[in-house]
Amino acid sequence: MPVDKQAKRKKSISSNEVELLYTKSKTYLHPTTSKKDNIPGYLSLSRGANAANRDIIISFMSEKQLSSEELKAYENVDIADLQDDLEALKLGGTNSRSSGKRNLNIVSKPPTSSAFGFCFSIPISFVYSIQVRKPSVGWWFGSIIINTQDGEKLPIVFFHDDESPSTLKNQKVRNQRFDPFGDNGEMYWGGSDFMNALGKFADVQKSSVEPSVYLINPESNDLRNFAPFKEPKTAKTETNQEPFKLPDVNKFFANAKWKVLETVATFSAKTRNQVLDLVDENAPMPIKQIINKPEVQKIGNEFDSARVYLAKWAAQVKEEAEEAHRKYQLDDEIYNKINKELGVGSNTEILTDEEVSKTSRRKPISKVEWEGLFDFSGRLIISIDEIKDRIFHGGLEDCIRGEAWLFLLNVYPWDSSAEERKTLRNSFQTAYEEIKLKWVNDDDKRSVDFWKDQKHRIEKDINRTDRNLSIFQNKKKISISGVGSDRLPTTRESSPETPDEADDDEFDVSNITNPHLFKMREILLTYNEHNVNLGYVQGMTDLLSPLYVTFQDESLTFWAFVNFMDRMERNFLRDQSGMKNQMLTLNELVQFMLPDLFKHLEKCESTDLYFFFRMLLVWFKREFEWSSVLSLWEILWTDYYSGQFHLFFALAVLSDNERIIRQNLSRFDEVLKYMNDLSMNMNLNHLLIRAELLFLRFRRMIDIIDRENSLKKLNNPGVYDDANNSLIKISPALRELLSKKPVIQKETERPEGVGGG
């Protein structure tokens, strides 16, 4: 809740008062089976001063307990236009409609209980679940049962819909609209109003085990406990033959994709790219033989660095991978032990039902759920691990990404308050403007060839950025552009389409008329000033655009991009050592986790895993639809399991397509084409589940090996040790995958005369 709104509320409401947010009249307690003993009252939601959504009170007050003034307030709220009021109230506790004229309905704070049990009140944070019993045959009145966190038994609340003015009014309106159903498509009744109102202030999740039970602000374990175990579909006949197979997910796609490969051998030769001409002279012979293949050129045409990598590093990655294979190869004995312990090759599953259930995907965090995670001062009320668990397994709704991403990208500390974040926001704006002025006000700097080259690279890529998004659809370039962001170029209405790449030389790429692309250019030029050693490299626009679209604020986007680039900088180093190290680690991971597939890739001469270069470079930005990319990135930013979880996601892509590759592909170009064609045809959630299962298996395999080494040392001291190479070895690169810290690798100082990119 914003601080200024808290102050206004504090002036209006004392500590012994609450504001009524919702009431439902003619709700009853049935203390006995006799109708004459029924107790009529009001079921309500109310908020005290400085109360966050989790502190909102659910209460039942009997009519006899209310004064005449309070009774009038309860009646007014009951028959008010609930939908409009709740829309105005749900965001942080604002007390007015857009006009600011709404009167507060202030009443005395409900007591916790009465001597006769005729009332109760409980904060939302104390409610574990609510069982909703709709009116039906045998249950003339619908009712709700509130289950508390500590198991306290509260009276059952019955809804006498035939007496309630608000229910009768709403039912009449629905009948006039010929729509007697509630928002969820079920028959309307009074309890629907209460649950809808509660959903404005709390995360209400329907249990998949018992449909009548709704969990209130559930934690991850609550949802798992109320979800059925998932039974992976695995063919028993393949278990012994395929010991490293995870449960198949989305295989129907891979089967269909094979038809595309029937024409793979009919590729026609194409003219080599100029960049390939330059590197071809020094490329190893095996590379020269594949450098002209269309699928290689397809990747190379997108990123110049991909061509350089292929010519300079691909062969070395193969050689080092082979060396690692010899040095760290696990023998059959340890693999058999691992398989036996993990249940592979027997009648048991690789992972338990509980472990598989924990990997299930959840709904994205909604705005209501997100707001419920903070107290009245804006501080997180759950642990960082808990919120990262929730984001990892569900992601975020788009409406809260603009706030949540600032935490994930370490722009805002997780333990900060709303007031502290406001102060930080102002300091970020000032700091950004100071860095930007270093190039805006320096005519000499802008006249240097290096700066001009960087600017041209940025502008050329900016004009190609996510042209399918309406926010980036460009206008025709016709006039001279400004230097800073104060003054946009003159524009005229024209085709909204961004020019095709083939037309790049037909217009002035520096004349960026789209205001959003213009701001992105300013951000990248300012980042160039901030990180002078790295400079601009092709592919950075792919990383920047999702951030800008989410924040649409120049300074916030800049600092989010700075922090994102801290972990991504190794992808853009001049010597490409960062990409080489990742490809080598992925290679070792495939050997370790999918040994049979790796052996097949050796036969296909594909162990350099070149088809993953683009995927790793820009974190699968070209492999998924826009919304899926946003979901994937926020999940990777959590570092929930590993600071390099993107490598397990890449491993999941291979694992998901292992059968097709092993059974049908036998050449480098076939494998490359097949993997390239997976773009825009993969199921994100299925791959995330598979990646998580692969990581859990990887971690258990490491544990088993470490335990075996410890037992050898314990039982035979002096015989087994690291010096005589008698212990089972795991490479440092694989062990580093267990760390939750992202790998940071910075560019060295730029040598004089060396250009950017």
From Swiss-Prot:
Keywords: GTPase activation. The keyword Lyase does not apply. It comes from the Eukaryota. This is GTPase-activating protein GYP7. GO terms for molecular function: GTPase activator activity. The gene is GYP7. One of its GO terms (biological process) is regulation of vacuole fusion, non-autophagic. PROSITE patterns: TBC_RABGAP. It holds the Pfam family RabGAP-TBC. One of its GO terms (cellular component) is late endosome. Most effectively accelerate the intrinsic GTPase activity of YPT7. It is also active, but to a lesser extent, on YPT31, YPT32 and YPT1. YPT6 and SEC4. Residues 498-507 have a biased composition (Acidic residues). Residues 482-507 are annotated as: Disordered. InterPro entries: Rab-GAP-TBC_dom, Rab-GAP_TBC_sf. Residues 395-640 form the Rab-GAP TBC domain.
